[in-house]
């Protein structure tokens, strides 16, 4: 019944299995893959014909995690998987990016890749396995895919690279890098690093490339046994159409691409395209054969690319007049918004990001439910890209895949530089509002995030900057571009984003639109990016060089204290009664952890102090000889009862009210008076004895200790005089 084909190999100390012929047989390609006990199913279906009028390649990649894969039931009311999580969106992009450039030019058939996680051993992350399985399914499917590709994760522990580190091993790694590519070249890199050098990063990329070659060979062996017949596909020859369009509009397009200002350039390019469109419309009106509008648009795009690319390769001059290494003018400003905890406006050429940092408490942490379990995230970074940023109208609403991906890249760049949570116990939310975009808005977000966090008083280990690099490659000739424009991104061959500090790289993302690039090109790009990053950090330092000494005026203050674990129940109280009363009366937010750590937060220092004193009064005992603030709660003939140390009450005997003789207690104090008392001890019945006369009521100084100190000093003086 089943025609099963299977390939196995030992890869990084674990067995990788690729199998086809048993599951999802009606898909064009289907591969059941496992690594350790993590298992995925990848399927590919591609339409037989493109939709009429289709002018782009409609590739969709859906990565989905099923909670049964980890033996869990989904949370929530409906108890089934819902909209894609951030992780699912990011892995979908991770798979999409290296496979997209390998489809044949001109192929426009609707194509869907679906990868489903069926089992997760909680050791091996399914993302790389999913990429490998998708590559294998595409290779078997018969669609015009110029693969296969391989992929690998690389860690860096103790100055050594680690192939496919487990989830636990990654916790000790200074690097989390995923690389994908063909047997000849690298196509995609995604990474987070702890200030590693460019040499280490490049070494990691090439280490991963070498070690996924056996995977590519296994996919080829599987394809030799089980691949479907290649689909017939012949790209349309547009050479005659291109010659005509060159005749009509090449001169106008060349002139347009010498205009440095984006909007003016777009208007000139639009005018040239309109001229072409009108020419072919007139042909149709005259009854002559006219090409399809989508073919005209495709040829025009190719002509634009050639004009821009050869101007750079031949003359070293870019669209806006810069040479290949120059970064656009930068303006950095902080403290832009009056009520925000931290804010920055970062402008680089025609790209601008308004970035706002907000500090919160443990209650504000994001609860994340993943296959690995549930946890809380205290650093959130949200990237918004409204249509007005590029002078267009468009959809507004929940973030798309691109916004989620760009936000996560900026998150990776900043995350290694955050202070340890126990040193800075705040929840951090950063929002980047892209106000203008002409290339590299994600790297503007990195720069703005660094500035806004420092403006909020967050003690980053070092400022972080990011830069986007581009590539123009024709045969053996290439040019690496620093700080690319949007047009250079669209018309170029690479989008290579590098973020880091003066000391090293913290994040690296690379997407290639051609069949891959070599180690030499990556080496040039990394070196050029390092110079650009240093320049940007210098420009940022004109606004702020390090975190402000104090938190923002409107930010909450957090104090941390610790109590014995067996006292937690008393602080919380029956049904939370006690903790609710403390919060209500003091106005502070209180978070109690299982180990007895308590975080008290409020914008008011008095509120925090009151909450701390209240908790101390429950969880600990007052110390004999210590001085406390108190309130007179009752005046009696023989003294006054004073509330102190939270909810503790003690008696100040009439003889302890004042140094002077007191006839009536009410002559010295009355109910509600704020006083300072010293705990002098306990009577035989365990009742607390307090003294007011032992304390200076203005300064809180211990008068008994002061008198003793003066007496001891005088005695030492007498003894010294006698000795003489």
Curated annotation (Swiss-Prot):
Pfam families: KH_1 (PF00013), PNPase (PF03726), RNase_PH (PF01138), RNase_PH_C (PF03725), S1 (PF00575). GO terms for biological process: mRNA catabolic process; RNA processing. GO terms for molecular function: 3'-5'-RNA exonuclease activity; magnesium ion binding; polyribonucleotide nucleotidyltransferase activity; RNA binding. Mg(2+) binds at residues 489, 495. Residues 556-615 form the KH domain. It is found in: Cytoplasm. Belongs to the polyribonucleotide nucleotidyltransferase family. This is Polyribonucleotide nucleotidyltransferase. It comes from Azorhizobium caulinodans (strain ATCC 43989 / DSM 5975 / JCM 20966 / LMG 6465 / NBRC 14845 / NCIMB 13405 / ORS 571). The lineage of its organism: Bacteria, Pseudomonadati, Pseudomonadota, Alphaproteobacteria, Hyphomicrobiales. The gene is pnp.
């Amino acid at each position: 019944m089943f025609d099963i084909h299977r390939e196995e190999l030992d890869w990084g100390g674990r067995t990788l299995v690729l199998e086809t012929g048993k599951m999802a047989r009606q898909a064009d390609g289907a591969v059941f893959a496992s690594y350790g006990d993590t298992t995925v199913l990848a399927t590919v279906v591609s339409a037989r014909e493109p939709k009429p009028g289709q002018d782009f390649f409609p590739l969709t990649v859906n990565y989905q995690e099923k909670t049964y894969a980890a033996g869990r039931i989904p949370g929530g009311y409906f108890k089934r998987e819902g909209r894609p999580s951030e992780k699912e969106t990011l892995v979908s992009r991770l798979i999409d990016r290296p496979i997209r450039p390998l489809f044949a030019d001109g192929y426009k058939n609707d194509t869907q890749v679906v990868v489903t996680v069926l089992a997760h051993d909680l050791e091996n992350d399914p993302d790389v396995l999913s990429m490998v399985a998708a590559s294998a399914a595409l290779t078997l499917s018969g669609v015009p895919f110029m693969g296969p590709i391989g992929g690998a994760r690389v860690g860096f522990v103790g100055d050594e690279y680690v192939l496919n580190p487990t989830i636990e091993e990654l916790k000790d790694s200074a690097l989390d890098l995923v690389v994908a590519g063909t047997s000849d070249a690298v196509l995609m890199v995604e990474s987070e690093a702890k200030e590693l050098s460019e040499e280490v990063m490049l070494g990691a990329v090439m280490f991963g490339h070498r070690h996924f070659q056996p995977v590519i060979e296994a996919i080829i062996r599987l394809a030799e046994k089980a691949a479907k017949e290649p689909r017939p596909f012949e790209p349309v020859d547009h050479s005659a159409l291109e010659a005509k369009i060159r005749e009509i509009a090449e001169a106008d397009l060349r002139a347009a691409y010498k205009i440095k200002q984006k909007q003016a350039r777009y208007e000139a390019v639009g005018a040239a395209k309109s001229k072409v469109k009108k020419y072919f419309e007139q042909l149709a009106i005259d009854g002559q054969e006219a090409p399809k509008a989508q073919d005209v648009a495709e040829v025009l795009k190719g002509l634009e690319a050639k004009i821009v690319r050869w101007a750079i390769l031949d003359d070293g001059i870019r669209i806006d007049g810069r040479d290949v290494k120059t970064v656009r003018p930068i303006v950095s400003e902080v403290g832009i918004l009056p009520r925000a905890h931290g804010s920055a406006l970062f402008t680089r050429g025609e790209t601008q990001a308004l970035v706002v940092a907000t500090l919160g408490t443990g209650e504000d942490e994001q609860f994340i439910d993943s296959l690995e379990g549930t946890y809380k995230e205290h650093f959130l970074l949200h990237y918004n890209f409204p249509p007005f940023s590029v002078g267009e109208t468009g959809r507004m609403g929940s973030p798309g895949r691109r916004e989620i991906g760009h936000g996560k890249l900026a998150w990776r760049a900043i995350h290694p530089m955050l202070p340890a949570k126990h040193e800075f116990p705040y929840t951090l939310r950063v929002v980047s509002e892209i106000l203008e975009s002409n290339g590299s808005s994600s790297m503007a977000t990195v720069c703005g995030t660094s500035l806004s966090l420092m403006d909020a008083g967050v003690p980053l280990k070092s400022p972080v900057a990011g830069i986007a690099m581009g590539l123009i490659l024709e045969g053996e000739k290439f040019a690496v571009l620093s700080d690319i424009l949007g047009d250079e991104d669209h018309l170029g061959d690479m989008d290579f984003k590098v973020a880091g500090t003066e000391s090293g790289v913290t994040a690296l993302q690379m997407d290639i639109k051609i069949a891959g690039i070599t180690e030499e090109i990556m080496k040039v790009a990394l070196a050029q990016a390092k110079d650009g990053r240093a320049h940007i950090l210098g420009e940022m330092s004109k606004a702020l060089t390090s975190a402000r000494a104090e938190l923002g005026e409107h930010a909450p203050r957090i104090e941390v204290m610790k109590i014995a674990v067996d006292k937690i129940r008393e602080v919380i109280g029956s049904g939370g009664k006690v903790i609710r009363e403390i919060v209500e009366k003091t106005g502070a937010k209180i978070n109690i952890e299982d180990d007895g750590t308590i975080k008290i937060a409020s914008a008011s220092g008095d509120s925090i102090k009151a909450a701390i004193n209240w908790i101390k009064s429950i969880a600990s005992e007052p110390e004999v000889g210590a001085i406390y603030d108190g309130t007179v709660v009752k005046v009696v003939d023989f003294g006054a009862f004073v509330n102190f140390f939270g909810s503790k009450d003690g008696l100040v005997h009439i003889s302890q009210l004042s140094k002077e003789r007191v006839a009536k207690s009410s002559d010295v104090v009355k109910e509600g008076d704020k006083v300072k008392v010293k705990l002098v001890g306990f009577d035989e019945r365990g009742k607390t004895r307090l003294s007011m006369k032992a304390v200076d009521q203005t300064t809180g100084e211990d008068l008994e200790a002061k008198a003793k100190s003066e007496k001891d000093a005088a005695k030492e003086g007498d003894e010294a005089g006698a000795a003489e």
